Amino acid sequence: MRIVALDVGNRVGYAEWDGYLTELSTYGYYEQIMKLFTHLTAVADADTMFLIEEPRKGSKRARSRDLGRCEEKAKTLQAWITACGGNVKMVKPNRFTKLKPTQFQTYWPDWEGKTSNHARDAGMMLWLWLKQGVR
């Protein structure tokens, strides 16, 4: 099963798992929509699970002033992916956010390459999902 994790904000963290970590990137919001459109039309299968961080599920302390915008973007992505036939799971923000690159390497030691905070957050959302054995 392919799993795509999206950390939504002004920039979207993107992590993709297909038996191994295949991509870890950061996109602008509209770039992300185009990537998802290409992905959904090319793959068009129910064997891909999309994880989207739901901003309102976090603690009050973790919420930012941009919460409303992030929440709207997350809900728009959820509705859009669902309309395209994709499986979506809204997930609670986890405690493994804003890791430094060296800390991130302890969880994904095989990943080589630069990462942004957004990409690492998406990668950790994916890591936690896989660790919990949820499919």
Language-model segments: what does each one mean?
Residues M1-R135:
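Phosphate- and other anionic-substrate recognition elements at nucleic-acid/protein interfaces
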